[in-house]
Amino acid sequence: FRRKIIIKVPQRKKYAVIDVFAGPGGLNEGFVQRDNIFGPFVSIEKDSVSCRTLKVRKIYHLLKNSKKKNSDYIEFISNQSNLDEFLDLPKHNKLKSIIDNSIWNHELGALDSKKTAKEIKKRLKNQGWDEKKGDGVIIIGGPPCQAYSIAGRSRRSQMIKSGEYNPH
């Protein structure tokens, strides 16, 4: 006589991640790698080049475990298609929707805070986040890197010319 024991494991709660001043996504990367706990994601970045990098990384993470789709990614990375052409292919409609909701090329402060919050919620909901079910949210981000920003370099060159620059 065998007895079957069924253990119900509660589903682990997932936390949406809002990455402000995302840059190319370095801080976000660790959270993305733990997608069993964290997700969906909204990365907010004002620099369009950094947003392109975020999109390429998002494509990589979405396709890396799919053998069929992995060949699409390899084709894309091999420069046989550009990012827009790749995402505009009908077979990538779902992928494009995720990318469009995950990455927001936007300067924080350009809209009032209520409009910004509404847009972020919309993007999270479009990816399956449900505030009413108690889905959590984590906000990550850091200040813009002044040492490498265009404004920071310009300001430093002016300080050097005027003798005000002190690197220590």
How does the language model describe each region?
Residues 1-168:
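Conserved active-site and SAM-binding loop architecture
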